[in-house]
Amino acid sequence: MLINGTVVALILAMMLVLIQDLRRDSVVMEAITLPKVLINRGFTPVGTSHWLNHHVLAISDLAATTKSQNSFQDQDSEIEIDVPGAGISLRSISKALRAVLGIKQTRVAGEIICTDDICSDANMEMRLRVYDKEGIKIIPVGTFGDVLAANLNDDDLDLYFETAALKLFEYLDPYIAAAYLFQTKKSGGRERAVNMVKANHPDRAWAANLIGLMDMRNEEFESSDYWLERAIEFSENDDIAGFARPIATFGYSLHRRHLWDEALEKYDIAIKVDPTYPNVYFLKGLTLFRMKKFLQAKNEFQTSSEIDPASVRSFHMWARSAAALGSKKEAEKMFQKTAAMKQVDMQLYPQWYNFREGLGENGDDIMKSWEINLGIVAKDLLPEECMPLLVLMARFAKFNQKCDWPYYQGELLEHKEFCESEMLNEKSAP
């Protein structure tokens, strides 16, 4: 009975794992075949595949989208369970069932080949092979010389593998490539998104929304309105349920033109379309904050943070709203909560400093209470960080002898014009 129970438990466990595997829209990254010259230099087929997958996952992450995506995994990370005495495994069962049921599982393999007789660095080329329901697709990445114009080293190879990963996304999911280029401020994102719309890609609503967002940020509002309206139209025609993003983005575009009431109308429509979309509550809160309706704004930021507890900006604006209402304890609690989160808004400490100073606290005492926090911020301070944080860091450096006061003083002078222009832009936006 014990043996039978164990067998039943094993079968049930395998069935659960199998069901989960079949439900995943997964892409398996297989080994990349290499020429001997690279193997002799320490490269391996599996390691090369891992390197490519690392950049695939990085692009997917930096695209910062909630759109459904493929799940990428290395071949050697696939779950493999052998059935004793049966000569079969979970992987083989999964493959067979996918074939019978017509369930897609994309596999990516490839090779690096030599395009000249001596197999020089510049003339090696990666070619990816994608196996999916459409058949086999060959994706040439280009030679190392074409992409890099440099010898092989880790930094150059990272750029090459990023290029390879982008080309893979252009075939598998072009929206991710476009969003990644937009989020990382690289060229080519708009062109890819426009091509998706022209091709009537299934994600054309997402692409049109992205174009509208790009144009809004460039203050090209007429073009932005056009693309956001198309995104809304596409989502309706393509039956994309709960696609509130272009409506919310349209609302924020109106906000940036100081059309507060019209913006609020758009946000309310977006909330009806998708009441679980946290960004629309945050954007509505920003508009209410600019209208000095601080209590209503605070409620929106609170709702946004409840839906998305990792939203640093929601807690930050909750703190600012509470401070504007004179709710000192609540504001201090929210400032502290925001500071404890991993990604801190650059404006947090200057605003928190002003809040505490406004309560009558001594500036040196405030600095002392933040010594550890500001030390961490100082360590990661970038030259392009703007005036409010630089000013505060300069105060901290003067207060704390461990910090390099001349350095921050120099940073203030060097970036004064840039930071003042950025602050001017901040005044025209929330």
List PLM regions with ranges:
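C-terminal/domain-edge helix-coil "capping" segments
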Residues: 1-22, 117-120, 131-214, 218-226, ...
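Short beta-strand->alpha-helix linker/helix-N-cap micro-motif
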Residues: 22-121, 133
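Helix-start (N-cap) detector for alpha-helical repeat units in TPR-like alpha-solenoids
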Residues: 171, 204-205, 238-245, 278-279, ...
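Residue-level recognition of tetratricopeptide repeat
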Residues: 179, 213, 252, 286, ...
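Single-residue signature of alpha-solenoid repeat helices
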Residues: 190-193, 224, 263, 297, ...
